[in-house]
Regions:
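Motif-centric detector for short Cys/His coordination patterns
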Residues: 1-94
C-alpha cells in the first residue's frame, strides 16, 4: 500500500512532516494551499480515517500510525484554536 507524506506549516511558522498510510490524502489537500485551521483538521481527520480503513481492508487491522498522526495534528491545532484567523499551509505532498 503506497504511503504519502505531507509537510505543513502551522500558523506560528513551524513546519511538520505528516504521514498518511494511503495516497488518499492527495484528494483532500493541494500543495501550496492554505486552509483555515478547522477545515485543515477536518480534512486531515477524514483523509487519515479513510487511509486507516484502507489498511484494515487489506491487512485486517486499522493503521495505528494514521491515528497517531491524527492525534498529533489535533494536539498541534489546539494550540491555535483561539485564533479565528489561523491558517495551515500545506507546503508539499510527498
Amino acid at each position: 500500500m503506497p504511503v504519502m507524506h505531507f509537510r505543513v506549516q502551522w500558523p506560528d511558522g513551524t513546519e511538520a512532516n505528516c504521514y498518511s498510510p494511503s495516497t488518499v490524502v492527495g484528494e483532500f489537500f493541494v500543495a501550496g494551499q492554505r486552509y483555515a485551521l478547522g477545515d485543515f483538521v477536518e480534512r486531515a481527520r477524514e483523509a487519515l480515517h479513510i487511509g486507516s480503513e484502507r489498511v484494515r481492508e487489506k491487512y485486517g487491522f486499522a493503521c495505528s500510525a494514521a491515528m497517531d498522526q491524527l492525534a498529533q495534528i489535533e494536539a498541534q491545532a489546539e494550540r491555535f484554536a483561539s485564533d479565528p484567523q489561523a491558517k495551515v499551509n500545506v507546503v508539499e505532498l510527498l
